[in-house]
Amino acid sequence: MAAATRYMLDTNMASYIVRGSGPALAARLVAVPMAQLCVSSVTEGELLYGLARRPSATALHTVVQEFLRRLDVLAWDSAAARRYGALRAALEAAGTPLGNLDTLIAAHALSVGAILVTNDRAFARVPALVVENWGAS
């Protein structure tokens, strides 16, 4: 039996979900089993940074914490680090670097064989990374 496809939500998609997604994104979320959804611990860090900048937004804190509780948050590991080193060097050599956090997330998705769900077109520059935009643009 083949392993189920994993979908890693980028920070922008996670933010859209937390803020209340549009109909296309909501439809995709309903169609995909929760066990197939994940975020990188890098995305978790970005979401928590956003909360730290808005300590009085208690409703947002509750929503983000619940979102993170329901999804698999994949820990950054040595496999992701090895992929990051090679990916960053390749992107820089090609003259097409990504931002540091985006490179970390792309490397993490590649290291676990996940499809990256994002609307950031810059990820198309990453060789071998499968990207899907679930309609939140």
Protein language model annotation of sequence segments:
Residues 2-3, 72-117:
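Active-site neighborhoods of divalent-metal-dependent phosphate/nucleic-acid chemistry enzymes
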Residues 1-39, 49-66, 137:
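Short, well-structured N-terminal submotif of metal-dependent ribonuclease cores
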Residues 6, 105-137:
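Acidic, metal-binding active-site segment of PIN/NYN-like and related structure-specific nucleases
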Residues 10-11, 25, 47, 84, ...:
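Generic structural signal for small/hydrophobic residues in well-ordered secondary structure
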Residues 13-14, 43, 80, 105, ...:
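Alpha-helix capping/helix-boundary segments
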